C-alpha cells in the first residue's frame, strides 16, 4: 500500500512539474507592463477588446 502511495505521489510530481515550467514562458507577455492592456501615458493606445472602446489601437 505504501508503494502505491509513493507511485501516486511521484506520478503527480513528474506530471505537474513540466506543465508549470511550460506556462512560465507563455505568461511573459501577460506580465510585461507594455502589453496591450497597459495604458500607455505616451500614446493612449490599447489593442485589447476590453479597452478598445476607450482607446485607439493604432495598428
Curated annotation (Swiss-Prot):
This is Alpha-conotoxin CIA. It holds the Pfam family Toxin_8. It comes from the Eukaryota. The lineage of its organism: Eukaryota, Metazoa, Spiralia, Lophotrochozoa, Mollusca. Negative results: does not show effect on neuronal nAChR alpha-4-beta-2/CHRNA4-CHRNB2 and alpha-7/CHRNA7 (when tested at 10 uM). It comes from Conus catus (Cat cone). Expressed by the venom duct. GO terms for cellular component: extracellular region; host cell postsynaptic membrane. The modification Cysteine amide is found at residue 57. It is found in: Secreted.
Amino acid at each position: 500500500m505504501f508503494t502505491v502511495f509513493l507511485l501516486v505521489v511521484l506520478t503527480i510530481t513528474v506530471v505537474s512539474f513540466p506543465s508549470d515550467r511550460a506556462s512560465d514562458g507563455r505568461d511573459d507577455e501577460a506580465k510585461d507592463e507594455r502589453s496591450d492592456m497597459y495604458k500607455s501615458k505616451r500614446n493612449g493606445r490599447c489593442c485589447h477588446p476590453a479597452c478598445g472602446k476607450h482607446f485607439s489601437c493604432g495598428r
